[in-house]
Amino acid sequence: MQDNEIFEKVQDIVAEQLGIEKKIVTREANFSSDLGADSLDTVELVMAIEEKFSIEIPDEDAEKISNLSQVVDFIKSKLNTISV
């Protein structure tokens, strides 16, 4: 799966979960300070991403992820591990 494809899927999830316009969900937008996500929103985002990509994001990794770029990198690494 390509970088842009992952980004677009995650962008859709974030926009839908947070009820915001897709165009403001950029790669560098911080979930809490830029997009207004609270801790519950973050948990729901992680769950939706896990479901969409059939991966597991451990809590300690989820706590380190603050923007879409980091999510995309994490998903790519997980998918590469699965496919090897």
From Swiss-Prot:
Cross-referenced InterPro entries: ACP, ACP-like_sf, PP-bd_ACP, Ppantetheine_attach_site
Domain Carrier residues, every copy: 4-79
Entries under PROSITE patterns matching the protein: CARRIER (PS50075), PHOSPHOPANTETHEINE (PS00012)
Compartment list: Plastid, Chloroplast
Post-translational note: 4'-phosphopantetheine is transferred from CoA to a specific serine of apo-ACP by AcpS. This modification is essential for activity because fatty acids are bound in thioester linkage to the sulfhydryl of the prosthetic group.
Assigned keywords, A-Z: Chloroplast, Fatty acid biosynthesis, Fatty acid metabolism, Lipid biosynthesis, Lipid metabolism, Phosphopantetheine, Phosphoprotein, Plastid
Predominant localisation class: plastid
List of residues that carry O-(pantetheine 4'-phosphoryl)serine: S39
Cellular component, GO annotation: chloroplast; cytosol; membrane
Single GO molecular function: acyl carrier activity
Gene Ontology biological-process annotations: lipid A biosynthetic process
Pathway stated in the Swiss-Prot or TrEMBL entry: Lipid metabolism; fatty acid biosynthesis
Gene3D superfamilies named in the record: ACP-like (1.10.1200.10)
Family assignment from sequence similarity: Belongs to the acyl carrier protein (ACP) family.
PANTHER family reported for this sequence: ACYL CARRIER PROTEIN (PTHR20863), CARRIER DOMAIN-CONTAINING PROTEIN (PTHR20863:SF76)
General function of this protein: Carrier of the growing fatty acid chain in fatty acid biosynthesis.
Name this polypeptide is given: Acyl carrier protein
